[in-house]
Amino acid sequence: MTQNHPLKWFSVVVVIVWCVLFLRAENTEKSIVRALFLEQTDTGWSAGLFYQFPEASADASETDAQIRFALASGQTPQAALTQTEEKLPRKASYRLCDYLVLGQESDFDTLQTCESLFLEHPYGRLASRVFCADFSGTALETQNEEDEYLPESLLDLLKSDKTAPHLYENRNGVLLPVLELNDGELSDREERLLLTETGQVTLTADQTEAALFLSGAKHTCQFQSETNPVELTSLAQSVELEGEDFHLVLTCRVPPDGRRPTDEEIARWETLCTETVRLCWENGSDLLRLSSVQALRDGTNTLTTKNACPEVRASVKMLDL
């Protein structure tokens, strides 16, 4: 028993040393991919990787290493990614790849291609937040040659948007933030791009606010008025079925430092909500899940966006808290 005691301690030390060496190799000997850029081109696909090396930690969401960018092309997304990985200083690790940026010619098929790619290969996660760019990978690569901190600015922009949809949410269409690159400066538009199985449409800034508000992506919205912007916070939202029509009820309040909207402004907001619901429906997105509301009442789901948009009216109830 006494003779085995030193051997046990030696075994424990060996295991600890092995774990330390393994974790060090896992953390510092890989190129940590933070975001993925994919676009379809005339000749195939382009894939860009925003990565960090070698100080990045595979177990932390915040890292200190400078973000770098590598771009390559291929006949398929996988081939393009393989070519891009060959440009990295070490083997790519996608454990912290939380963002997917689609190129300017992307459509709903591109989304589904990415979903299938992530399911079959470890290039990203279905929980990745999705964005759309109005620039090409080549334009980004060219600008990066002039500004080495551009990839870092882009990652900061991606991280700051908590309303971008996850890739797995694409079944009902997705409302994508649109990134711009003008004179070397990155920004995101107030207008968003709605991608659905049947097409795509760009929503205005107010329609975007309404869509994010109604979908639950934002609990506070701001829309323009003739004087100052009006800000509302959602307390509750319900959809009631009245015959074949729907009644959307929004219970809201004004933030402590905000002003109460006038009756005319509330009426405009109600109209904006119904117009946004109809616009999304006509482009293949059931923003309020009206089909589910009908199915709960009737027991069958016969209402789809292939049908004409049902009549929807909105009512806003203001509470003073």
Model-predicted segments: where are they?
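Membrane-proximal alpha-helical signals and transmembrane carboxylates
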Residues: 2-321
